[in-house]
C-alpha cells in the first residue's frame, strides 16, 4: 500500500498544477492530507502501532512526568514534515499555469485521487480499526465471563512483582542478542516460563499492561472520551483487581516506581485498587537522592531496585503478608538510559554501539541481583517472584531488528514450591498474568476478570482467545464491557455531590462534563475535553446532558451555582439548577416546562492567570489588558480553584484599548486565587498584562 500512497501523492501534485481552477482549494486539501500524514508519522514513531488506543488514552491522560526530551529527534523530523506539508500552498503561489482549460475534469480527478490516497494511507486503516473498537456493541454475551476471585487463600505467600519496562522476552534470542540477558535467561530455567505471550488491544502501554495483568481487563476508558484522569474521581471503580483481592485477604500492597505516578493515571489506578503505599519519583527527591541519579523519566533503576530491596526487608520483618510491586524505567524507548551502577558496563554487539542494548544488559543484571537477594534471604522461601514485561517494546533504536523476530512478552514465576516448566501458550496474553499467579497461590483459583490461568488445561473462554480468533471480531465486546467499569451500568441519574463533582453511576467526575446517551438512554459517550465544542457539534439521536456552572448557559447568572442543560432526541431542552442537581435528575424523565429552538452556544472557562496565587483578605482592583478579545461583553471571575468557590464575578466590556477593571473583595485569605473568563469555543482572549492591586481607601481630610 505504501507504493500506492506514493503514486497517489505524486499524481495529486501533478493535478494541482495541471489547472488553475480551484487551485487554492486543491492546495488546501493536499496540505491538510500531508499534515495528517505527518501527525500519523510522529504518533507511529511513538506508539509503534499508528493511532491506536494508547494514543487516544495519552491524549487525555495526565502527561506530567513524561520524558519528552527523549523524543526530540522525532519531534524535529515532525516539524520538518509539517513545513513540507505547506509546500502545495507555496507551489500554487509560484507556479505559472500553462493550461487553463479542462479545470472541471482536473478537479474531479484530483478529488478522486485524493480519496484513493486516503484509502491507501494508514489513516484509513487506523480510523477503521478505532471505529470497530469503539463502536457500540452488545457485550451481554461476555458478561458471564467476567469473574472475580472469591475464595480465601489458605497459604498467604508474599509476592514481589517486578515489571521490566519494555523488557520483552524477544531479547532472550541468543542468535540475535548473544549474551544480552544471561541472568534472566538463567532464571527462566528455574521458573514457570510462559511463552508466546501477546499484548491485546488495550494492554500495549505501561498503565494498560499493568491494568491488564492485575485486573484481567483491557484498559479502555469512560465511554468514548479516552480518559482525562485528573477529572475522574476513581480509576475503574467497578473493576476488582489483584490488589483489591489481596487486601481483602489481609495483604499489604506497596508500590515503588522511579517515574512520576501521576503520568497516565498510574498512581490513581494503584490507590484505587488496594495499594496502601505508592512511592514514585517524588519519594526519591524527598530522600535527597542526588540529581545524577535521575533521567528525564525519573530515578534510575539501580537506586530504584535498592529501594525495593530495603522495602522488601521492611515488609518481611513486619510479618504481614504483602505484595511489593516495582516498575523499572531505564529500558524505556527510544534509546534507554544507563545508571551509574552500569557506567563501566558495555554490551559488544555486531549491531553496533547502541545505548539501548547497554541499558537492557544493565537491567538484566540489576533485576537478577534483586531476585538473588530476595531468594537468598531468610524470607525467600515464603515469597513468589514475578518478572514480567509491562508490554512489548515500542519504537526504539532496535525496532528494525525486533521487526524481524517473533515478538513475545516476558512472564516468569519463581518460588520454593513452583516446579520449573516452560508453558507454551497458543492464545495467551498479559490479561492472563494475574489469573496465573492466583492459581500458583491457590490451585483452585483460575480466573481474574477476563483473564484465565495459563496453567489450566481446561480454561474456559477468555478475552485472549477472542482477540486471537477470527481477526479479533468478537474482542470489541470485551472492550465494550470494560468501558462500563468506569461508571457502572446505572447511569441515568445525575447529581452534584458536596464536593461539586457530578456523580454518574459509581463514578465522580469534575465538571464541565457532557454525557451523550443513545436512543434507549444508555450512556454512550462521556466528553471531558472541549465540551462546549462537542455540545455544539454533536447531533445525537438520543439525549445530551451538559453539566457546568450556570454561567456557561445564562447571561444573568452570577451565583456560581451548578446547572445541567438536558436536550432530548426531539431537541426539547430544560435547564436544571443547583437544587435539582443536589437531589438528582433523571435524564430519561419527560422534559416538562421545556424550551424549543436552536441549542444555545454554551460558554467555557478560560484561565487568564498562569498559576494560582496566594492572596490576603482585603479589597482589590483587578486590571488587565486584553490584546485579543471578544467583540461582545463577557463574564470575568475570581475563583478559588481548590475550594471551587466563585469569589467575585462581573459582566465586562473592554474599552478601546482592551482594558478591563473589576473590583474583587476577599473576606478571608485565599491560597489559590485564579482569574478566568467565560467564552464560547469560537471566542478567544489574550491577556498582555494582569494585576491585582490592593484598593487603599483615601483618608477623609475634611
Curated annotation (Swiss-Prot):
Pathway per the UniProt entry: Glycan metabolism; osmoregulated periplasmic glucan (OPG) biosynthesis
Topology with respect to the bilayer: Multi-pass membrane protein
Disulfide-linked positions: none
Protein name according to UniProt: Phosphoglycerol transferase I
Protein purpose: Transfers a phosphoglycerol residue from phosphatidylglycerol to the membrane-bound nascent glucan backbones.
InterPro entries in alphabetical order: Alkaline_phosphatase_core_sf, OpgB, OpgB/LTA_synthase_biosynth, Sulfatase_N
Compartments (UniProt record): Cell inner membrane
Amino acid at each position: 500500500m505504501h507504493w500506492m500512497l506514493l503514486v497517489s501523492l505524486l499524481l495529486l501534485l501533478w493535478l494541482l498544477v495541471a489547472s488553475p481552477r480551484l487551485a487554492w482549494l486543491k492546495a488546501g486539501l493536499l496540505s491538510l492530507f500531508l499534515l495528517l500524514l505527518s501527525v500519523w508519522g510522529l504518533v507511529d514513531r511513538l506508539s509503534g502501532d499508528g493511532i491506536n488506543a494508547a494514543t487516544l488514552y495519552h491524549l487525555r491522560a495526565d502527561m506530567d512526568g513524561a520524558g519528552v526530551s527523549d523524543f526530540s529527534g522525532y519531534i524535529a523530523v515532525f516539524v520538518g514534515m509539517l513545513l513540507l506539508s505547506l509546500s502545495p500552498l507555496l507551489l500554487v503561489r509560484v507556479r505559472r499555469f500553462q493550461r487553463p482549460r479542462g479545470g472541471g475534469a482536473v478537479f474531479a480527478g484530483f478529488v478522486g485521487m485524493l480519496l484513493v490516497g486516503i484509502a491507501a494511507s494508514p489513516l484509513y486503516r487506523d480510523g477503521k480499526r478505532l471505529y470497530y473498537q469503539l463502536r457500540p456493541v452488545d457485550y451481554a454475551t461476555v458478561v458471564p465471563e467476567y469473574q472475580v476471585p472469591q475464595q480465601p487463600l489458605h497459604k498467604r505467600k508474599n509476592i514481589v512483582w517486578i515489571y521490566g519496562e519494555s523488557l520483552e522476552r524477544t531479547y532472550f534470542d541468543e542468535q540475535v542478542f548473544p549474551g544480552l540477558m544471561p541472568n534472566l535467561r538463567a532464571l527462566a530455567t528455574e521458573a514457570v516460563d510462559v511463552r508466546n505471550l501477546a499484548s491485546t488491544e488495550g494492554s500495549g502501554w505501561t498503565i494498560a499492561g499493568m491494568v491488564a495483568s492485575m485486573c484481567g481487563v483491557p484498559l479502555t476508558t469512560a465511554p468514548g472520551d479516552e480518559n482525562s484522569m485528573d477529572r475522574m474521581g476513581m480509576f475503574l471503580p467497578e473493576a476488582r483487581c489483584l490488589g483489591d483481592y489481596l487486601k481483602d485477604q489481609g495483604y499489604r500492597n506497596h508500590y515503588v516506581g522511579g517515574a512520576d505516578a501521576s503520568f497516565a493515571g498510574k498512581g490513581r489506578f494503584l490507590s484505587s485498587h488496594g495499594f496502601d503505599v505508592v512511592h514514585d519519583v517524588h519519594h526519591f527527591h524527598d530522600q535527597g537522592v542526588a540529581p545524577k541519579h535521575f533521567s528525564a523519566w525519573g530515578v534510575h533503576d539501580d537506586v530504584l531496585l535498592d529501594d525495593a530491596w530495603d522495602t522488601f526487608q521492611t515488609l518481611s520483618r513486619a510479618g504481614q503478608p504483602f505484595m511489593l510491586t516495582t516498575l523499572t524505567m531505564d529500558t524505556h524507548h527510544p534509546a534507554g538510559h544507563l545508571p551509574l551502577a552500569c557506567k563501566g558496563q558495555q554490551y559488544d554487539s555486531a549491531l553496533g554501539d547502541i545505548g539501548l542494548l547497554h541499558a537492557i544488559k544493565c537491567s538484566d543484571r540489576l533485576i537478577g541481583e534483586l531476585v538473588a537477594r530476595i531468594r537468598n534471604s531468610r524470607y525467600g522461601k515464603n515469597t513468589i517472584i514475578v518478572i514480567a514485561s509491562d508490554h512489548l517494546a515500542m519504537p526504539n533504536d532496535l525496532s528494525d531488528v525486533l521487526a524481524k523476530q517473533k515478538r513475545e512478552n516476558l512472564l516468569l514465576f519463581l518460588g520454593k514450591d513452583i516446579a520449573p516448566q516452560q508453558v507454551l501458550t497458543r492464545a495467551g496474553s498479559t490479561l492472563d498474568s494475574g489469573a496465573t499467579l492466583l492459581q500458583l497461590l491457590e490451585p483452585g483459583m483460575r480466573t481474574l476478570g477476563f483473564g484465565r490461568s495459563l496453567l489450566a488445561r481446561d480454561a474456559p473462554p477468555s478475552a485472549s482467545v477472542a482477540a486471537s480468533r477470527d481477526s479479533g471480531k468478537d474482542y470489541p465486546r470485551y472492550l465494550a464491557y470494560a468501558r462500563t467499569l468506569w461508571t457502572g451500568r446505572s447511569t441515568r441519574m445525575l447529581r452534584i455531590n458536596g464536593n461539586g463533582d457530578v456523580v454518574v453511576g459509581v463514578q465522580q467526575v469534575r465538571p464541565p462534563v457532557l454525557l451523550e446517551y443513545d436512543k434507549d438512554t444508555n450512556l454512550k459517550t462521556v466528553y471531558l475535553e472541549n465540551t462546549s465544542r462537542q455540545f455544539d457539534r454533536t447531533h445525537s439521536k438520543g439525549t445530551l446532558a451538559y453539566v457546568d456552572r450556570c454561567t456557561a448557559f445564562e447571561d444573568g447568572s452570577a451565583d456560581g451555582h451548578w446547572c445541567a442543560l438536558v436536550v432530548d432526541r426531539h431537541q426539547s431542552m430544560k435547564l436544571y439548577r443547583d437544587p435539582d442537581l443536589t437531589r438528582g435528575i433523571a435524564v430519561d424523565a419527560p422534559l416538562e416546562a421545556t424550551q424549543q429552538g436552536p441549542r444555545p452556544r454554551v460558554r467555557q472557562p478560560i484561565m487568564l492567570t498562569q498559576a494560582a496565587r496566594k492572596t490576603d483578605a482585603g479589597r482589590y482592583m483587578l486590571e488587565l489588558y486584553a490584546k485579543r478579545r471578544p467583540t461582545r461583553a463577557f463574564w470575568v471571575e475570581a475563583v478559588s480553584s481548590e475550594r471551587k468557590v466563585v469569589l467575585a464575578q462581573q459582566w465586562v466590556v473592554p474599552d478601546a484599548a482592551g482594558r478591563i477593571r473589576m473590583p474583587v473583595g476577599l473576606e478571608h485569605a485565599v491560597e489559590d486565587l485564579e482569574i478566568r473568563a467565560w467564552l464560547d469555543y469560537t471566542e478567544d482572549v489574550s491577556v498582555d498584562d494582569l494585576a491585582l492591586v490592593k484598593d487603599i481607601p483615601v483618608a477623609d481630610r475634611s
